[in-house]
Design a protein with these regions (language model features):
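Membrane-interface "cap" regions at the ends of multi-pass membrane proteins
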Residues: 1-11, 128-131, 144, 150
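A generic, lipid-embedded transmembrane alpha helix
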Residues: 1-13, 237, 241, 355-359
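Helix-loop-helix module between adjacent transmembrane segments
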Residues: 2, 29-129, 198-206, 309-316
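Loop-to-helix junctions at membrane interfaces in multi-pass transport proteins
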Residues: 12-37, 67, 112-113, 145-301
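Hydrophobic, small-residue-rich membrane helices and short re-entrant helix-turn-helix hairpins
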Residues: 59-67, 131-142, 209-245, 314, ...
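Loop-to-transmembrane helix boundary motifs in multi-pass membrane proteins
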Residues: 72-76, 87, 118, 324-359
Length: 359
């Protein structure tokens, strides 16, 4: 869950609920949930089509299937594309979260951006250096728990601050046109069939065919337990995403309660308070860190812990997966019978450090 829900999800999904592209247009509302439904269907395909295949072939790297099915060139190409795409994607998500922490907190402490990045990467490097996937399973469990707890605490605080129940919040969101899930306009890019089918294939490609996402599943003892893990994960993921969307609606209700409104400022259409943009990725940090209205310090601390907890599972998993894929798929470490264990270990550590520097 932590690997799937990165810092991008943590700030962008709530921030996108009230997003309006132009004056007079309908908000995105809960339209993202259409994609989440597609995710769920995709996980069923992964659990009952791809996982049995991986277990039958006893794969350490899922790209070995390409070698067995299509030959060495397809194998190396698939692994290379994974390394390229995961490097770009993971560093982009890492940058977003560190940038938010830097802009809202660290910059005021006069800490340079490169120092912030170096400290985060050093922490990830230290606890993945020895443990690999085994360490990540435990650390990701803790970090994901903190992230979800932070999400629940923030939702509870919003409800308490506005003195409303969950039912009343949903009614207010409905009045603000923030509860629409399904887009029935076939000409729209958000048409529900497009979103659901797109979400399904995103999951099949970005989970079922991704070494980072599958490394934990194929390390489970047997196929039945791995499928059970995948199915329970997919159900929980649906509810966690729904909670993120509810938080997004509450954040906009809270922002409007504090005087924010849609307007054109300097020729730019957006959601502003006192001339400052508080929409999209800026919304959650602006509320949680007290920039819109004074909040208890504990809420700011909870937000920071939850945001960091959202950052680490996606970054550490990517670092470990990139290391294992490069060593096994590109260097062919398992087949290097002329290398002793000490040399193989030295190569693994060198690749691990190199991937950290690449980040």
């Amino acid at each position: 869950i932590g690997t799937s829900l990165s810092g991008v999800t943590f700030v962008s999904v709530p921030g996108g609920v009230r997003h309006v592209a132009k004056a007079g247009a309908l908000p995105n509302a809960l339209g993202y949930f259409q994609v989440v439904i597609g995710y769920f269907l995709g996980y069923l395909v992964v659990a009952y089509v791809l996982l049995p295949l991986y277990y039958r072939l006893n794969l350490t790297s899922i790209y070995h299937y390409l070698q067995q099915r299509f030959g060495n060139w397809a194998y190396k190409t698939g692994a290379s594309f994974f390394i390229l795409s995961r490097s770009v994607g993971a560093t982009a998500r890492l940058y977003l979260v560190i940038n938010i922490l830097h802009i809202f907190i660290l910059e005021r402490m006069h800490i340079p951006f490169w120092v912030s990045v170096a400290v985060v990467l050093l922490m990830i490097l230290l606890y993945t250096f020895e443990g690999g996937v085994r360490t990540i399973v435990y650390t990701d469990t803790l970090q994901t728990t903190l992230m979800v707890l932070g999400l629940i605490i923030c939702v509870a605080y919003m409800l308490h601050e506005m003195n409303i129940s969950v039912g009343e919040a949903v009614n207010q969101m409905q009045s603000a046109q923030l509860t629409r899930i399904f887009n029935t306009d076939p000409n729209s890019g958000g048409f529900f069939l497009k979103q659901i089918i797109g979400g399904m294939f995103i999951t099949i490609a970005m989970t079922g065919l991704d070494q980072e996402m599958m490394q934990k599943n194929i390390s489970v003892k047997n196929l039945a337990d791995s499928q059970k893990n995948m199915l329970s994960f997919s159900v929980i993921l649906v509810f966690v995403n729904l909670l993120f969307l509810l938080l997004g609606g509450l954040l906009y209700l809270y922002a409007m309660h504090e005087g924010a409104a849609f307007a054109v400022v300097n020729g730019e259409w957006g959601f502003y308070q006192n001339g400052l943009p508080v929409t999209g990725d800026n919304l959650f940090p602006s509320v949680a860190l007290g920039l819109m209205h004074t909040v208890p310090p504990v809420i700011s601390v909870v937000f920071i812990i939850a945001l960091i907890s959202a950052l680490f599972p996606s970054a550490d998993g990517a670092l470990t997966a990139l290391t294992s894929s490069f060593c096994i798929d590109i260097l062919g470490l398992k087949n290097r019978i002329e290398w002793d264990e000490q040399k193989k270990r030295r190569v693994r550590l060198t690749v691990h450090l190199s991937m950290t520097l690449l980040f």
